[in-house]
Amino acid sequence: MSLYFPTPAECGRHVIFGTVPIRTYAGDGIQLSLVDIPAGGVVDWHSHPQEQMGMMVTGRAVFEIGDEVKELGPGDFYLIPGGVRHRVTSPAGPAQALDVFHPVRPEYR
C-alpha cells in the first residue's frame, strides 16, 4: 500500500447507521470519509468530539446541524464543530459527501 496514493480497495470500509456505506483514509491527524447516502438514507442524530467539515459531491441532502436546517447540493460546504449534534437525510435520491475530520475518528480508521 502506498502511503501517499492508496487505492480504493486499501481504504477503510464501514457501514454507518445500518445503511450508509463510507470509505475512509487517515493520516496522523486528519481523516477523509466518502459518504454514500442511499435514497431515503439517514445519518441519524449524533455528535462526536472531532471537528467535521465537508462538501457535497453529488445529489442533495438535508443537513440539520444544531438548530439550523439546510438542503445542500453539489459543491456546497458545511462545518460541524466538535460536540454539536447533527443529522443528514437524503429524501429525494442518493447523495455523496466528502467529510474531513480532525482529529482522526479511530473507530473509522
Where are these regions (language model features)?
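Glycine- and acidic-residue-biased ligand/ion/polar-headgroup-sensing regions
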Residues: 50-52, 56-61
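A short, N-terminal "cap"/entry segment at the start of jelly-roll beta-barrel domains
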Residues: 1-29
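Ligand-binding loop in jelly-roll beta-barrel domains
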Residues: 82-107
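Structural motif
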Residues: 31, 60-62, 69, 85, ...
